[in-house]
Design a protein with these regions (language model features):
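A conserved beta-turn-beta hairpin within the catalytic core of GNAT-like acetyltransferases
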Residues: 71-83, 93, 141
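Conserved beta-strand in the GNAT
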Residues: 54, 61-71, 82, 87
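Conserved active-site alpha-helix within GNAT-family acetyltransferase domains
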Residues: 111, 115, 121-145
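Short hydrophobic/aromatic beta-strand or adjacent loop that forms the aromatic wall/cage
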Residues: 50, 143-149
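Short, well-ordered beta-strand micro-motif
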Residues: 54-56, 67, 148-152
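Conserved acetyl-CoA-binding loop-helix of GNAT-fold acetyltransferases
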Residues: 85-88, 94-107
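Short amphipathic alpha-helix that is part of the acyltransferase structural core
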Residues: 1-39, 43, 47, 52-56
């Protein structure tokens, strides 16, 4: 069973930056450069945003991850920061890894004085089970309407 100690902040593991960017790119199609740029910004940011987190298996393979960015490609910049790119590899699902990551990142944001977090998704019910509340529908940059969730971090 994984615990919070198994979550790594990519700032603390520069040797994983390229591999993590490739992994996220493969899941979401966002350019590797965009992930690398965001991770480079995270290294100099004092605010806690952006930030990138992962869980590795015993062999060092990335099995889950997520990020925190200002805006996850939607037209409501006032609803920030955004948890983004939440992904757990199929063979590792239903073991609480996404919930573990979500709780961890909210704790990290709270430590930085950020009291609210948002995320967009097409999923229903999952985020409610993780303690998030449906907030509103928002328009993505593509024009598609998606669900916006909110959570108080502390």
């Amino acid at each position: 069973m994984f615990c919070e100690a198994d979550i790594i902040n990519l700032n603390d593991h520069p040797e994983l930056t390229e591999r993590y960017a490739q992994w996220q790119h493969g899941k979401w199609g966002v350019s590797v450069k965009a992930y690398l740029d965001s991770m480079a910004e995270a290294k100099i940011s004092q605010s806690g945003v952006p930030a990138w987190y992962a869980i590795l298996d015993r062999d060092g393979k990335i099995i889950a991850g997520l990020g925190v960015i200002e805006n996850d490609f939607h037209k409501r910049p006032d609803l920030a920061p955004n948890v983004c790119a939440v992904y757990v590899e199929e063979g590792w699902r239903k073991q609480g890894l996404a919930r573990l990551l979500l709780n961890h990142v909210c704790g990290e944001l709270a430590k930085k004085g950020i009291h609210d977090a948002y995320l967009i998704t097409t999923h229903e019910n999952f985020y409610e089970r993780c303690g998030w509340s449906f907030h509103t529908m928002v328009e993505e940059d593509s024009g598609k309407q998606v669900r916006m969730y909110h959570k108080h971090t502390s």
